[in-house]
Amino acid sequence: MSAMNFRYSDYDVIVVGGGHAGIEASLAAARLGAHTLLITQTVDTIGRMSCNPSIGGVSKGNIVREIDALGGEMGKLADACMIQYRLLNKSRGPAVQSPRIQADKFLYAQTAQYTLEKEKNLHIYQDTVVDVISSQTAESGVVENGSVQAVLTARGRTISARAVVLTTGTFMEGKIYIGEFEAEEGRLGEKAAIGLGTALARKGFTMGRLKTGTPCRVLRKSVDLSVLEIQEADAVMRPFSFDTAEIFRPSAVCYVCYTNEHTHEVIRQNFHRSPLFSGKIHATGARYCPSIEDKVRKFPERTRHQLYIEPEGLMSDELYINGFSSSLPEDVQDQMLRTLTGFADAVITRPAYAVDYAVISPLQLGPDLQTRRIAGLFTAGQINGTSGYEEAGGQGLIAGINAALYSRACSTQPQPGTRPAAYEPFTLRRDEAYIGVMIDDLITQGVDEPYRMFTARAEYRLKLRHDTADERLTERAFRIGLQKQSSFTRLQEKLAQRGELIKHWRERKITGSLAEAEPALQCHLGKSFADALHDPLISLELICRCDPESTRYSDAIKTAAELEIRYEHYIIAQDKRIDKMKKMETSRIPANFNYDAVSGLSTESLARLKRVMPATIGQASRIPGIRPSDIMVLMVAIK
């Protein structure tokens, strides 16, 4: 059927939820040719930034660039609404540097909605999904080895699809808390999606609850910003997307502020009114993003905590108080806010609140983010136990790609409702992408608190730099049809130019006249420019100053060539470790492998293997508590 005449039935892919995971999932599926329906509770809130108005950060910025390299949208959306840019960790090595931007959150959501609306294979529908209908459902409601058939909405509609992607965010069975007040909402003033979490549990899925929170928003005109420290931004806004050449937009200013003993005293006197401490909230929150009352309680020796004052948009007078998340009552929020320097007359427009919500244990997923219990059902984002827009977007992209590929394989299946043998999932390894690291962590280790990406989680972070995302991923996306020919051609040109410049620097020697003009080169006399770059005291600027030929290349190409040379010995060593890892990753474990039939496995390892059901020997080796001797037994058993 054509993209113009398909109706709200018989879709290839249905995506549930219009947040950052849902945006990437629905666009990826539609762009791969799947007739896609995005169902969201409120069309007007698609792409809304529920918490801080920023994109990127340490390792998170790398994920955004990976999304872009794979043909996703988050990087382009960030470029379209960027109002400040900073490259984090500039004083440290390139493996831990990441871009972070402040975004105009209203423009971000508006641009996201328009992008979805104009996508030719995509429809948007406003309703609430309360159940996923599948085959192989027992009288008890439990599903074993079922396949997706349809979704059921709150208004009683049954909409069929070959694949469904759940990206429910904080809305599935969500509840917000502000002191003594609580309500079934996923965001302040927006009703929760009630019913779907219960339906999934009834089907046999292991469910849990996690918590997050957000700080209050404050009127800019009520704050004396002149007494606050300005947070310096980079002079030039650099794009996230490889498709964006330059960014020319008005820049906004962020500020730094600190809590003080008066703030902490107000908080301490009201610990008993916090639902976090009174027993109302039982769900676990993010370890690395605690509420202000949690910080004051856990670190009583600290006399102050740093806060960042961030604008919500260029056409908004609201400020976001980063680091001031709370679930305390509104009167307490007023008191503690006014103890801050410059905030004596501050006016809150939206109170801080905590929200807990239902999640699915990601141990029930495969590396394609498909559930093992129901074929064709994929999950992405906070439903899998992660936190953050970027983590959600990365998962959404992978889930959307695989939902489209699964649907395509179903269309060639002679018997509807059975698992398609032709389905070949699109997955990422740990050495390919931070997205690959994240998904492997989720499905191998599970979560007991909201998962956040850090560079320290990646063993191969020197290979996963933000500037190499296109080199690692664009060709793969091009091969499945998600990247354009122009993007692939640009990548080939980049690699050719970098290789050409590296070859030139390996051949060009440091002469006596150059060493005389640049004393720093004296100890490298007779060596190549490339050899000199191994010396940390020799800068790229010095090399370019001595080499007029390098002016033919862009700054990006010169920097890429420099890093390739400067870290080549480390990269070679890392490549050797990757080769060893790949051998274990290619040793696949059959999907329905009977671990009980393997003699020699320890009891605890047997239980862990059956719980995770790893896809490869490599994944099995990363399950916490699995011993090397058990891996050897397993390798013998699957041969």
Annotate each language-model stretch with its function.
Residues 457, 463, 474-632, 636-638:
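Extended, charge-enriched "interface" segments that sit outside catalytic cores
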Residues 16, 158-169:
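Short hydrophobic core segments
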Residues 133-157:
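Conserved beta-strand-loop-beta-strand element in the redox core of flavoprotein oxidoreductases
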